[in-house]
């Protein structure tokens, strides 16, 4: 008997499992006979096909329960994250309603001092940035003598009295009543939207929980389970197809971007060449203006007696051309002189 126990080996089903897994699997299959020797129990259990089938089903159920627990933990973390709230990135805060008909709010003594001294200090030291100016004015206010500081405080008190009187009169007008109704309607709409969003979130969480519960409640190896697997496989195929289409689109867009980048680089090279060409032409034009000015400096225009300068050479040449075309017979001598000057320029 001892030789049989020492020579017997565990079947492959238990060869790779540790002690804790063996105890869990045996508990799942319902083996409640601790007094039976281990070798004989293992041999008889592995020879029984019903035991192997029950063991595999128990392992599947255990893996499904662990997946369900992980899903519940993930859902709990998402709920906690949504409860923390916060202003989502990308959203814009709506500006509060502003009553344009309301009286102007009063200014404090410190604000009056800041408004008065800020422009003076900015005009005196324009290179100082705005935060530094504010800090300097704060130090100046703290060191201001009490009698000078009291002047700003008295002005603030008078402004506050003015505001209270105007506000009391404004609250009796129809414009204030209209603004109050708008504010109340906006608050009601805001609370209604918040309730609707909260209800939609709750419904979505409930629907997700029901779907997950319905998925985990499907018995394995049934027609419903097979249909569910087929639906998941069809969904995965559709997602793979969509993914391939998007990848093809991205590749085409990438090629288009590369071609556009090449075209832009070519245009930039052309722009640089045109700029250098314009620079050369501008230099040539300036040289020509100087030569014409020096050549025609001793030739005043008939009638006006105008002589050219570097700044007026363009208008001088236009008027010279008009005189030559208008009265060539009356200005033959002048035209002959112009021809001589031009001939010297060609040489």
From Swiss-Prot:
For bias kind Basic residues, which ranges apply? 83-96
Q: Which residues bind DNA?
A: 103-171
Q: Which PROSITE patterns match?
A: HMG_BOX_2
Tissue specificity statement from the Swiss-Prot or TrEMBL entry:
Ubiquitous.
Where do the TM regions start and end? none
A Gene Ontology term for the protein's cellular component: nucleus
- Tell me where in or outside the cell this protein is found: Nucleus
- Composition bias (Low complexity) maps to 55-66
What Pfam families does this protein's entry cite? HMG_box (PF00505)
Tell me, in a sentence or two, what this protein's role is: Plays a role in neuronal differentiation as chromatin-associated protein. Acts as inhibitor of HMG20B. Overcomes the repressive effects of the neuronal silencer REST and induces the activation of neuronal-specific genes. Involved in the recruitment of the histone methyltransferase KMT2A/MLL1 and consequent increased methylation of histone H3 lysine 4.
Q: How does it assemble?
A: Interacts with DTNB.
This chain belongs to the protein called High mobility group protein 20A
The root-end lineage is: Eukaryota, Metazoa, Chordata, Craniata, Vertebrata
